[in-house]
């Protein structure tokens, strides 16, 4: 093979490879960026759900907003105040959404309770002084 033909083929393959990588990045970049932006809030939400499941109500109490703490009264009353009336056996995180100014995140969980009933729990978090806190909890029963 001629040296010029080899250079043209290698250059063509390199251009195709670069275009392929750019296409993959263009397709998946929005999801990757969103995952990076929501990760700290999702960690707080996951910790809250784990605390509720494991009965660490004091831990869960520290992750909610001042308004929720004030209305619930104390850590022991938190699940009832939020509408989580049965023990959680398992939960799986579903979707998460972040608002345009990146100060509010909503995280969905699919939950199985001790009596095998299922529900969705939506946690709304707000960024307060660089810390994420839970400002609202919605329990949607199936």
Question: What are these model-derived regions, one by one?
Answer:
Residues 2-50, 54:
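Short, low-complexity N-terminal intrinsically disordered segments enriched in polar/charged residues
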Residues 2, 54, 71-74, 99, ...:
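Detector for Asparagine
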Residues 97-142:
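Exposed beta-sheet edge and beta->alpha loop/turn motif
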